[in-house]
């Protein structure tokens, strides 16, 4: 067995021993040893291989797989710009704490700076965005040297996995594993044994997950509201408290609508995870008169306003909430929900908020919901839901719209045996439409419905400062960015079934049995979004 083939097989074997079950592969010459090793493992049923031609979408496919499965997912690619195309997915994985592994093949390091083809300084390319950038030396010729190097290859692979999973830090995230490979890049005719790992399929270096436990004492006799953001953990001893939960947070037992915060005057706040969606929440967290306790699952905690009084991982509570406070919060919550329902029913045009209401109202227990990071995740936070036991995903690490179709496909591939619904805007869909390109030999989601709320542009800007009517003539072009893309034709190009339906038809369409991937397009209006949201606030 030639050195590069032996090295690649040892690395792939050790990844599998460390818990990797899905790998995304992009074609190339320099990463051929890894490609052959991954194909062999896929054929043997040891992992599931997903081949993609575009490294950017491949990265977000891996983000979806890793976020939904909780396991590290490598993306293997050749050298050069192939590596650079992982940049957006790496940044998202960093801030969302997703265990993504960039498995980058490289030229031998002596070729750096020589003008060699498809060669760049790619080790360390991602800088501070990765938990670690790890490399291993070139494999050397000869069976004795291969046996001598095998422990180093396997040990480095275990180090990569530990960094990606946050085993020693409680801070999962992306890692670059850069492997220089020398020719020959294809297996020998006579083959040979793979360098052996530990007996019984054990990893070369076992790294137990760290226990990160920082208790914080909190007295609940003060009027308390919980703000649960992206990445929030479940805290059973806080379940009785009024909770404003973003869609990606665990759904609360005692919910408070985000718009209801303007009707309430809490005396303290317990912040779980990283809230990013609502201006009412941001204003509350910035109020220096109100103590804020930040509870997170890792070493970092959000504190945009610098107002957190204490941080930790769990609350040690004393006292009980005032029943009158709980009643006021419940009343405000229902008043806000009634305001949303009432204005949706009387508004003359279909908006993205209407589409979100029909999608969320059609959800069933056991579903997985993927939300676009722009208006859809915000809309889903405002409307009533039809089920509580729903797994919700959204790329809220850095909240970009790029890669959302690929993320949804990855999440659906990891959500076996259940239904996945994705709600995204038209710009988000068009931006990552190449994520629909799945080869005929590749695994496909069993049941993924992508609902495209199509208002022909960027509806979120209608609700921001740029959407002020005095800027209409300018903003409609440079922020609204109408595109006139034929969604149905785009789907046909990728052999994906699609329908264009009304919002009233959306619920029944979602209830229909579905296989594979389908797209439901609902035409919406964004010109009256500002008016609709103002009417909802006025109804409070």
Curated annotation (Swiss-Prot):
Quick check: keyword Cell cycle in the entry? no
GO annotation terms (biological process):
menaquinone biosynthetic process
Q: What is its EC number?
A: 2.2.1.9
Entry cofactors: Mg(2+); Mn(2+); thiamine diphosphate
Q: Tell me the superkingdom of the source.
A: Bacteria
* CDD domains assigned to the protein according to its UniProt record, in alphabetical order: TPP_PYR_MenD, TPP_SHCHC_synthase
What are the protein's UniProt keywords?
Magnesium, Manganese, Menaquinone biosynthesis, Metal-binding, Thiamine pyrophosphate, Transferase
Per the annotation, how and in what number is the cofactor bound?
Answer: Binds 1 thiamine pyrophosphate per subunit.
Q: In which pathway does it act?
A: Quinol/quinone metabolism; 1,4-dihydroxy-2-naphthoate biosynthesis; 1,4-dihydroxy-2-naphthoate from chorismate: step 2/7; Quinol/quinone metabolism; menaquinone biosynthesis
Q: Which reaction(s) are listed as its catalytic activity?
A: isochorismate + 2-oxoglutarate + H(+) = 5-enolpyruvoyl-6-hydroxy-2-succinyl-cyclohex-3-ene-1-carboxylate + CO2
Report the InterPro entries cross-referenced here. Answer: MenaQ_synth_MenD, THDP-binding, Thiamin_PyroP_enz_TPP-bd_dom, TPP_enzyme_TPP-bd
Enzyme class, first EC level, given as a word: transferase
GO MF terms here are: 2-succinyl-5-enolpyruvyl-6-hydroxy-3-cyclohexene-1-carboxylic-acid synthase activity; magnesium ion binding; manganese ion binding; thiamine pyrophosphate binding
Q: What does this protein do?
A: Catalyzes the thiamine diphosphate-dependent decarboxylation of 2-oxoglutarate and the subsequent addition of the resulting succinic semialdehyde-thiamine pyrophosphate anion to isochorismate to yield 2-succinyl-5-enolpyruvyl-6-hydroxy-3-cyclohexene-1-carboxylate (SEPHCHC).
Recorded family membership: Belongs to the TPP enzyme family. MenD subfamily.
SUBUNIT field = Homodimer.
Q: What is this protein called?
A: 2-succinyl-5-enolpyruvyl-6-hydroxy-3-cyclohexene-1-carboxylate synthase
Q: Which organism is it from?
A: Mycobacteroides abscessus (strain ATCC 19977 / DSM 44196 / CCUG 20993 / CIP 104536 / JCM 13569 / NCTC 13031 / TMC 1543 / L948)
């Amino acid at each position: 067995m030639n050195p590069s083939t032996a090295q690649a097989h040892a690395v792939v074997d050790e990844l599998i021993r460390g818990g990797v079950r899905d790998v995304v592969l992009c074609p190339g010459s320099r990463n051929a040893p890894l490609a052959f090793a991954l194909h062999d493992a896929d054929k043997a049923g040891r992992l599931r291989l997903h081949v993609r031609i575009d490294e950017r979408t491949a990265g977000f496919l891996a983000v979806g797989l890793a976020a939904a499965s909780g396991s590290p997912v490598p993306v293997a690619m050749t050298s050069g710009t192939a590596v650079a195309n992982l940049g957006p997915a790496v940044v998202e994985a960093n801030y969302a704490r997703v265990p993504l592994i960039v498995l980058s093949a490289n030229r031998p390091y002596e070729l750096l700076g020589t003008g060699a083809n498809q060669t760049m300084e790619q080790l360390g390319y991602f800088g501070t965005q990765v938990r670690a950038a790890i490399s291993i030396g070139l494999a050397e010729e000869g069976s004795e040297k291969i046996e001598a190097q095998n422990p180093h290859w396997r040990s480095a692979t275990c180090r990569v996995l530990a960094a990606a999973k946050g085993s020693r830090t409680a801070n999962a995230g992306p890692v670059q594993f850069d492997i220089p490979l020398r020719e020959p890049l294809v297996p020998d005719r006579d083959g040979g044994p793979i360098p052996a790992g530990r007996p019984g399929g054990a990893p070369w270096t076992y790294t137990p997950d760290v226990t990160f436990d920082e208790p914080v004492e909190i007295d609940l006799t003060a009027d308390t509201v919980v703000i649960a953001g992206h990445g929030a953990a479940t805290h059973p001893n806080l379940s009785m408290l009024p909770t404003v939960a973003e869609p990606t947070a665990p759904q609360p037992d005692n919910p408070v609508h985000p718009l209801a915060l303007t009707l309430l005057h809490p005396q303290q706040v317990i912040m779980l995870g990283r809230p990013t969606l609502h201006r009412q929440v941001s204003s509350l967290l910035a109020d220096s008169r109100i103590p804020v306790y930040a509870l997170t699952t890792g070493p970092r905690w959000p504190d945009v306003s610098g107002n957190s009084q204490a941080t930790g991982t769990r609350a040690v509570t004393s006292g009980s909430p005032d029943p009158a406070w709980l009643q006021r919060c419940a009343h405000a919550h229902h008043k806000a929900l009634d305001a949303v329902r009432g204005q949706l029913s009387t508004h003359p045009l279909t908006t993205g908020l209407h589409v979100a209401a029909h999608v969320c109202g059609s959800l069933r227990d056991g579903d997985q919901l993927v939300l676009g990071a722009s208006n859809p995740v915000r809309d889903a936070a405002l409307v009533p839901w039809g089920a509580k036991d729903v797994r919700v995903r959204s790329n809220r690490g850095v909240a970009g719209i790029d890669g959302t179709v690929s993320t949804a496909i990855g999440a659906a591939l990891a959500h076996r045996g259940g239904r996945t619904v994705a709600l995204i805007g038209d710009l988000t869909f068009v931006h990552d439409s190449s994520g629909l390109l799945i080869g005929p030999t590749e695994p496909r989601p069993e049941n993924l419905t992508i609902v495209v709320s199509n208002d022909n542009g960027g509806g979120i800007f209608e609700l921001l400062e740029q959407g002020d009517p005095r800027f209409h003539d300018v903003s409609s072009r440079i922020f609204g960015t109408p595109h006139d893309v034929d969604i149905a034709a785009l789907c046909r190009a990728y052999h994906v079934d699609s329908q264009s339906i009304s919002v009233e038809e959306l619920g029944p369409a979602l209830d229909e049995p579905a296989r594979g991937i389908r797209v439901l397009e609902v035409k919406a209006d964004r010109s009256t979004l500002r008016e609709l949201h103002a009417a909802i606030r006025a109804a409070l």
